Amino acid sequence: MHTLLAFIFAILILVSLHEFGHYIVARLCGVKVVRFSVGFGKPFFTRKRGDTEWCLAPIPLGGYVKMVDTREGEVSEADLPYAFDKQHPAKRIAIVAAGPLTNLALAVLLYGLSFSFGVTELRPYVGTVEPDTIAARAGFQSGDKIQSVNGTPVADWGSAQTEIVLNLEAGKVAVGVQTASGAQTVRTIDAAGTPEAGKIAKNQGYIGLMPFKITTVAGGVEKGSPAEKAGLKPGDRLTAADGKPIASWQEWANLTRQSPGKKITLNYERAGQTHTADIRPDTVEQSDHTLIGRVGLRPQPDRAWDAQIRRSYRPSVVRAFGMGWEKTVSHSWTTLKFFGKLISGNASVSHISGPLTIADIAGQSAELGLQSYLEFLALVSISLGVLNLLPVPVLDGGHLVFYTAEWIRGKPLGERVQNIGLRFGLALMMLMMAVAFFNDVTRLLG
């Protein structure tokens, strides 16, 4: 229910303001608006104010503004001057562009509001490299500072991760790093076309790199877990398993995963004294029917390292909204690059998310707090704005192309050309929606 409410609220805000952008500019341009609807389907709420009927409909996947238009039915003589299609192309361009531009402006405001409460940045340092992953095979080491990805400078962990994932399926990715010793080198990721690369989207961009270092100290013990039954407590330092020293938490995690139902003899330190316990990991079946072991222990992060890579500060209000502008421009450009790579075949369609994934992320971000939810809204608003500006018929961007061509030519494009374009655009969007729903279902099933 929490996830559903977070998703519905997001749609109401983002779609309402997108459509309100169209509405307000249409009114300013002298166009009569007949209906303003948030949601599709038969309205369950309607209210008439002036010439406009305001509606809420049950399918929260979009909305629309219906204007007087002679192409969509008979228009009275009195309403002809207020018909959308009778306006100068410049006015129609302004009306159509207003929706997505409102989304982009909203993103600036949402980011600015979030940043005004405070900002936490993670410097682009590698804390942990998980064994036997894409990152491990590329040679990444703990302490590496990521400086660039395929020549593009990166300033923080988020931008480094985004650039790596964006380029991963296009070919080799050259990651410029400064090692812990201060040497400059390049880590080359060569995973294009591999099964692992295809799973990156499902793993939320995870390639085996983490900014945090984790110790061999237990940070948490789940109630009722094998670890609790064996007497382990937070603060215990794991030293050996089955007689072999534990050098890292990853070694311990790999051992337990590979030992479902098997007894493990664990040595650990507590308050300077060495203890021994026998643990038998629970057997957990994954979505692919493989069995793994689970003991219910969480690691404790390295707090000294955390303090080194984390930077928290509170910018002035003016600076916060300036950062909101920069973030919006950056994410808009990243989104455009992704669509470009998608068209060229250098990015997988598995990265496309549908309403189920968006709803899930909405719920997660809302649980993390107001700032996280505001930044989620901003990111989705950018996606909505950029997507609608793409020059695809049926989208706002496609209409912008038609009206710009009409303005240049002095007459509209032929009806046949427009109809072919609309059919193509509709087919493309239906295909994209089908892929998004398919990806949602496969993620849901693991």
Curated annotation (Swiss-Prot):
Active site: E19
Top-level taxonomy: Bacteria, Pseudomonadati, Pseudomonadota, Betaproteobacteria, Neisseriales
Residue span, PDZ domain: 100-181
Location of this chain's protein in the cell: Cell inner membrane
PROSITE patterns according to UniProt: PDZ (PS50106), ZINC_PROTEASE (PS00142)
GO aspect biological process, one term: proteolysis
Organism, as annotated: Neisseria meningitidis serogroup B (strain ATCC BAA-335 / MC58)
Gene3D superfamilies: 2.30.42.10
Enzyme Commission number(s): 3.4.24.-
UniProt name for this protein: Putative zinc metalloprotease NMB0183
UniProt keywords, alphabetically: Cell inner membrane, Cell membrane, Hydrolase, Membrane, Metal-binding, Metalloprotease, Protease, Transmembrane, Transmembrane helix, Zinc
Family statement drawn from the similarity comment of this UniProt entry: Belongs to the peptidase M50B family.
Pfam family, one: Peptidase_M50
One Gene Ontology term of the molecular function aspect: metalloendopeptidase activity
Coarse class of the protein's main subcellular location: membrane
Gene Ontology CC terms: plasma membrane
CDD domains in the cross-refs: cpPDZ1_EcRseP-like, cpPDZ_EcRseP-like, S2P-M50_PDZ_RseP-like
